[in-house]
Amino acid sequence: MSEIYSFYAMMSRIKYIHRWGLMKNTRNENLSEHSLEVSMIAHALGVINNKRFDGSINPERLAVLAMFHDVSEIITGDLPTPVKYDNRKITNAYKELEEQARLSLLKMLPDDIAEVYRSILCEDENELLLWKYVKAADTISALIKCTEELIMGNAEYSKIKQ
């Protein structure tokens, strides 16, 4: 039973992971706040898709995927985007590191419960469209952060917003 507690204890560490580490910030943001915002945006995108464009996406599933989309960073930390995408070799190595981190988190759970979380933490071919929505929500969240920083007079974010 203590295995379960290890997983949730690790999940609770999400609030200690700071984002935008290479940037001067007028307001610091942690991964917990970011995950909630991305979840809310992803849910909204799903609702808008269904109501305005006659779609059939499950907004609740989007919200859950988005809620957990960056949990690997509990182990890896938040690698700044310019570093993460500097070249294909670094990008591929970091993606592998993130995958290993997700698998490490899943190993903290009994098999029956890990099965549920595996479908949330690990991208599935059958849900590629949902993951595209999560990525879009993540990008919108970054745009919101840049806009907020610019409104507060932090010109350092002007290049990122472009």
Annotated model-derived regions:
Residues 1-162:
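Alpha-helical, largely C-terminal catalytic domains
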